[in-house]
Amino acid sequence: MTTRSPARPLIARRSTPAPTPAPHDPAPSRLSYRVTRLWLTPIFRKALHLGIPVFALFAAVTWYLGDETRVAELFEAVQEIRREVENRPEFRVNVLGIDGASDDVTEQVRAALALDLPISSFDLDLDELRGRLEALPPVRTADLRIQSGGYLAVRIDERIPAAVWLTHEGLSIVDGDGIFVAGFGTRELAAPLPLLGGEGANLAVPEALALMEASSILDDRVHGLVRMGERRWDVVLTNGSRILLPEIGAAAALDRVLALDDMGEILSRDVTAVDVRNPGRLTVRLTDAAMEELQRLQTLAAERPDGDTRG
């Protein structure tokens, strides 16, 4: 049997040419170009290098603090470290020193501070303690400093008692500015103080002290000063007599009365008041007994013949 070869086509087929590959563009794509440009920006690179660690740290801290137990343990550890530092000997105050205050005021200062020594300097609020002390009536200003060796130095500028002020509410001690210092009898006084009376007397203490100084020539015959109508002063003597001073020029008017008394002892006579409120006129008011005696003498003088001057 003869093997037949496959039939060949009468018309030869032309082979299909392979597709031509697209030309390669060496330029980068827009996205690649923008990414490259962004990466080459110094600010972006720094932000990326710094931002990733910061974000990682923030995430870690957030995760750690998300557990209340761990937060409580961390807080307790910090508090323990703080306590150890605060309780170190070099930070403790062991001694309290008070300077510039009398014995009575010193006791008030100690009571106001109410410090339980020894105490850590971190537990002392000096501004708050200063406010306590300056709220005390006898304290003008206070200065507090923590010095080496655990010494708390307190410097007091004390109000000096200058006068005793009498009002309807009782007696009180005031300083040279008329500011309340203490109730009368609540503290010892180094010397007797001038007595002032009347409403508003505390507002004119400097003038009152000047008048008391001017009247010192009368020694202990001056009982005190009374403020009248919150405008002027009356000088009250121990025998009950008064010197009525004007609102303006009180010191000069008082000097006139003292000069008259030096010449004629007018204040030692039977007078109830010497009125010098009018600068151009001095008025003397006699006691009732003196007025009766004066009237008797005037009556006798009227009954006598003219020219008869015998008593």
Swiss-Prot record:
Name of the protein this chain belongs to: Cell division protein FtsQ
Transmembrane segments: 47-67
GO biological process terms held by the UniProt record: cell septum assembly; FtsZ-dependent cytokinesis
Organism field: Jannaschia sp. (strain CCS1)
InterPro entries xref list: Cell_div_FtsQ/DivIB_C, FtsQ, POTRA, POTRA_FtsQ_type
Superkingdom per UniProt: Bacteria
Main location: membrane
Xref: Pfam families: FtsQ_DivIB_C (PF03799), POTRA_1 (PF08478)
Compartment annotation: Cell inner membrane
Record flagged with keyword Cell membrane: yes
Annotated keywords: Cell cycle, Cell division, Cell inner membrane, Cell membrane, Membrane, Transmembrane, Transmembrane helix
Functional note: Essential cell division protein.
Region entry Disordered, spans: 1-28
Organism lineage string: Bacteria, Pseudomonadati, Pseudomonadota, Alphaproteobacteria, Rhodobacterales
One Gene Ontology cellular component annotation held by this UniProt entry: cell division site
